[in-house]
Curated annotation (Swiss-Prot):
Ranges of compositional bias, category Polar residues: 507-523
UniProt name for this protein: Protein NEDD1
Assembly and oligomerization: Interacts with FAM29A. Interacts with HSPA1A and HSPA1B. Interacts with gamma-tubulin in a HSPA1A/B-dependent manner.
One of the record's GO molecular function terms: gamma-tubulin binding
InterPro entries (UniProt xref): NEDD1_Spindle_Assembly (IPR052818), WD40/YVTN_repeat-like_dom_sf (IPR015943), WD40_repeat_CS (IPR019775), WD40_repeat_dom_sf (IPR036322), WD40_rpt (IPR001680)
Ranges of the WD repeats in the UniProt entry: 1-31, 32-71, 75-114, 117-156, 160-200, 204-244, 246-285, 289-332
One Gene Ontology cellular component: centriole
Role according to the record: Required for mitosis progression. Promotes the nucleation of microtubules from the spindle.
Subcellular localization(s) per the UniProt record: Cytoplasm, Cytoskeleton, Microtubule organizing center, Centrosome
Length: 660
């Protein structure tokens, strides 16, 4: 278990607990509501806590670096009762009694977008794994998916008005799997691509179900609780109930610890039970937490990187640890169930931060991993189609945030983390709450030791597009080329990856990326040269699939050319829809990042599939050769002439014995 990992619970007030000892660390209440606090959410760097009350008086952002201190108040009097942060903690989604879902920009402290598709009170909101969609549920039983990139909402789906949706959660492994619980005790797993039930667990709870939570380390496991005092564990593959426990009191809140082995469950009598999944007969610990019912429990994000996540290295997405992303075993396309932690937010492309060349060159394998970041992984056997649905949408609906938005919101000086051996690194410098600079001197950030081989890097989504000095760019390019030769040993692969990056660059430049005739052209070309190095380093670090060797360069070249051409066309079409010389908004850049990431994932999956097919074909050929060899041995190992001669001699011997 991570040292000093904490969790927060809400009831009549907010309390912060030590996760290992279950002892009280702090308590506070920034709200004036007599009905308690209904929703809480940690920021990605664990330094801030966002809260909303049951009466919807306001949304409060509090600093929890030292003593809890309210810093920011939003939505005063707007009756917002449920909150959720995106993976970068730059945007906050809320819903409440006014039937509205609001997206807040925490830098400007204003409503970024307001969605009024619900007909009744919004009870729960959540972002999906890549922050492109928001799922919200209401008292009327409706579930609506809102696209952040296209500003479109799906047709409401659900089970009817008699089934108020009480809680929604996305699976951490199957990106298109959404779980919901309702008042009539039905637990439903939804396929968000088709907006139809993947499976209904009917009448598993005899009273209203109150919470659902997916395991952060096991792709098959999730748990629900209800007012019938039941804790039920499920298997998503067999669609069966694994185990049912009965507690002493009605249960109201649940969350998994990042290690995946511990559950924290709140009850209507203010108690919190800690269960160990390895011995589920009774709770390991029980504490009296609140005077009223426990309405919400939220664990901090884990900042521990395990060996398995390091081995995965450059697989998909960057670093600390987030509920919405979990490592996937590249060898089998399945999930590596041991030692996986929640991975923290970042963008969809591995972020490259400038590092000293000498230290990077001296670290061997880890040097390339650190250069490319430690990316999040996505599930290769269930690729979500959610982002695909927004690829062809017109970007004209996006709000242009102006030139200053790129520099002010995502400052490269503020967001870039400097990695030094043996030094302490503040976790989450690139967090969305850096809009509070005056607090840095008052509340020093919580320090966490960072080793040279497992450095956790934080940056804003735009760091991959920020320009850097030409000398450093050339050094990064040379280092990447040398590392490439060491790990791949294939000049053809290098050429194919460069071809991909050049096509991306040409497609982007043809889409009117320039904001000024001279200097911005150079900056824009640098923005796309960095992802070229990054893509190459990311694919270099990918371990061999199923222990096989590097794919055939001819196959890789042909697949890469097709993928690159289609990707450049999509990017050019998307950006070309903007008005002339308009700067890219953060949403557009994130959309392009997601598009590139998904294309790389498709390419990686295609390579994996080709290698598996090749191995299967080789096995078939070997089997056919074995059978042919057996038949030839049986056919030619026996000499028919000799056998006939032996039989003739035997008959002759018998005849001679009979006569003489």
């Amino acid at each position: 278990m991570q040292e000093n990992l904490r969790f927060a619970s809400s009831g009549d007030d907010i309390k912060i607990w030590d996760a290992s000892s279950m002892t009280l660390v702090d308590k506070f209440n920034p709200h004036t509501s007599p009905h308690g606090i209904s929703s809480i959410c940690w920021s990605s760097n664990n330094n801030f806590l966002v809260t909303a009350s049951s009466s919807g008086d306001k949304i409060v952002v509090s600093s929890c670096k030292c003593k809890p201190v309210p810093l920011l108040e939003l939505a005063e009097g707007q009756k917002q009762t449920c909150v959720n942060l995106n993976s970068t903690s730059m945007y906050l989604v809320s819903g409440g009694l006014n039937n509205t879902v609001n997206i807040w920009d925490l830098k400007s402290k204003r409503v970024h977008r307001s969605l009024k598709d619900h007909k009744d009170q919004v009870t729960c909101v959540t972002y999906n794994w890549n922050d492109c969609y928001i799922a919200s549920g209401s008292l009327s039983g409706e579930i609506i998916l809102h696209s952040v990139t296209t500003n479109l909402s799906s047709t409401p789906f659900g089970h009817g008005s008699n089934q108020s949706v009480r809680h929604l959660k996305y699976s951490l492994f199957k990106k298109s799997l959404l779980g919901s619980v309702s008042d009539n005790g039905i637990v439903t797993l939804w396929d968000v691509n088709s907006q139809s039930p993947y499976h209904n667990f009917d009448s598993v709870h005899k009273a209203p179900a109150s919470g659902i939570c997916f395991s952060p380390v096991n792709e098959l496991l999730f748990v629900t609780i209800g007012l019938d005092k039941r804790i039920i564990l499920y298997d998503t593959s067999s669609k069966k109930l694994v185990k049912t426990l009965v507690a002493d009191t009605p249960l109201t809140a649940v969350d998994f610890m990042p290690d995946g082995a511990t559950l924290a469950i709140g009850s209507s009598r203010g108690k919190i039970y800690q269960y160990d999944l390895r011995m589920l007969k009774s709770p390991v610990k029980t504490i009296s937490a609140h005077k009223t019912s426990v309405q919400c429990i939220a664990f901090q994000y884990s900042t521990v990187l395990t060996k398995s996540s390091l081995n995965k290295g450059c697989s998909n997405k960057p670093t600390t640890v987030n509920k919405r992303s979990v490592n996937v075993n590249a060898a089998s396309g399945g999930v590596q169930n041991s030692g996986i932690v929640r991975e923290a937010p970042a963008t969809s492309i591995a972020t490259v931060l400038p590092q000293p060349m000498t230290s990077a060159m001296g670290k061997g394998t880890v040097a390339v991993q650190e250069k490319a970041g430690l990316p999040r992984s996505i599930n290769t056997d269930t690729l979500s189609k959610e982002t695909d649905s927004g690829k062809n949408q017109d970007f004209s609906s996006f709000d242009d945030t102006g030139k200053s938005s790129l520099g002010d919101m995502f400052s490269p000086i503020r967001d870039d983390a400097v990695v030094n051996k043996g030094s302490d690194e503040s976790i989450g410098k690139g967090d969305g709450f850096d809009f509070l600079p005056q607090l840095n001197s008052v509340f020093p950030p919580r320090k966490n030791p960072v080793t040279s081989s497992t450095s956790v890097l934080h940056s804003s989504p735009l760091n991959v597009f920020m320009g850097s000095p030409g000398k450093e760019e050339n050094e990064n390019r040379d280092l990447t080329a040398e590392s490439k030769k060491i790990y791949m040993g294939k000049q053809e692969s290098k050429d194919s990856f460069k071809q991909l990056a050049k096509l991306v660059t040409s497609g982007a430049e043809s889409g009117n990326l320039n904001t000024s005739p001279s200097s911005n052209q150079t900056r824009n070309s640098e923005k796309f040269e960095k992802p070229e190095n990054e893509i190459e380093a990311q694919l270099i670090c990918e371990p061999p699939i199923n222990g096989s060797s590097t794919p055939n360069p001819k196959i890789a070249s042909s697949v890469t050319a097709g993928v690159a051409s289609s990707l450049s066309e999509k990017i050019a079409d998307s950006i070309g829809n903007n008005r002339q010389n308009a700067p890219l908004t953060s949403i557009q850049i994130r959309f392009i990042q997601n598009m590139i990431q998904e294309t790389l994932d498709d390419f990686r999956e295609a390579c994996h599939r080709d290698i598996v097919n090749l191995q299967v074909e080789m096995i078939k050929q070997f089997h056919m050769q074995l059978n042919e060899m057996h038949s030839l041995l049986e056919r030619y190992s026996v000499n028919e002439g000799l056998v006939a001669e032996i039989e003739r001699l035997r008959e002759e011997n018998k005849r001679l014995r009979a006569h003489f």
